[in-house]
Amino acid sequence: MKNNSILKNSVFACAAAVFCTLLWGTAFPFIKLGYSTFEISDSDLGTKILFAGIRFLTAGIMVYIFLCISQKRFAVLHKSDFAKVFALGLTQTSLQYIFTYVGIGFTSGTNTSIITSCASFITVLCAPIFFKSDRLTVLKIVGCLLGFSGVIAINGFGGLSIDTLFGDVLIFMSTLCAAGGNIISKKLAKGRNPVELTAFQLIFGGLLLTVIGVILGGKLDFGNINGMLILLWLSVVSAVAFTIWTALLKYHPASKITIFNLLVPIFGTVLSGLMLGENIFRLETLISLILISLGIAAVNINKKAKNKNGKA
């Protein structure tokens, strides 16, 4: 049995995608705890970007060390891949988080969550343009509508406003970067080691964020043990989740994997409630989970039907 056979299994892929979104969901409360522990104010953009940069840079180094140990040699990025992987790190890590951290200061958390969720829908709708095997179907469109309804349900109907337009535009730019990152990642993963791809894109993206954070005057107290432990966990989350996610994108249609991202705000809400004492026992949470689950099922249902007929 080949090592990648389990990654090609649709049931494993669904379980792994849910696991990734669960890990990313833990980032919500841990980032809040990290800001509190390091005493990072809402207006301290430089330190926030530095915090993110160190998180992703450390994650990239973790993945690189794992790669070297597993291959029993130092991994070196081929010259012909340097610009491509740098573009992935710039898009999926650096620009996405810069737009997010700047934009969130000019809009509401509700708008941020709703607009960010559009990354999954943009990927589903655009994937057929870049990948012939990733067809747009009625079920996928229905799945997107159900998923978006679920995001609306958990966040309420605050709506967009001219007062938050600047922030909303920046968050949408972040969303485009996230969707673009998924497309680029899938294209680059073909014929390449997804672990190597993840390691270098996180290192490039994290390093750029770190430099920008320092230039903007960001500072962190590295003697703060609790803060560093939180930062370490966030790095582990990024290292594990991005590595698995990139591998899944290599072997499965982008639309069928990225739709699982809609679970991130659900896990984030539940875990924030458990860890930070926020109220999670709301009807909206249950309705949102049901709608998003139905949306994910709708997007993936064709694949399962084909598996039963032995065609996939």
Predicted regions and their residues:
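Hydrophobic/small/kink-forming positions within alpha-helical transmembrane segments
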Residues: 25, 29, 57, 89-94, ...
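Juxtamembrane helix-entry segments on the extracytoplasmic side of multipass membrane proteins
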Residues: 9-14, 44-47, 77-83, 156-177, ...
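Helix-helix packing/entry segments at the starts of transmembrane helices
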Residues: 19, 54, 93, 97, ...
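Hydrophobic/aromatic residues within transmembrane alpha-helices
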Residues: 34, 51, 103, 129-132, ...
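Transmembrane alpha-helices of multi-pass small-molecule transport proteins
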Residues: 39-92, 122-126, 146, 177-181, ...
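Hydrophobic transmembrane alpha-helices of multi-pass small-molecule transport proteins
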Residues: 63, 125-126, 136-156, 209, ...
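Glycine-/small-residue-enriched transmembrane alpha-helix faces in small-molecule transporters
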Residues: 1-50, 160-187, 230-231, 311-312
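Specific transmembrane alpha-helical segments of multi-pass solute transporters/efflux pumps
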Residues: 68-112, 153, 234-252
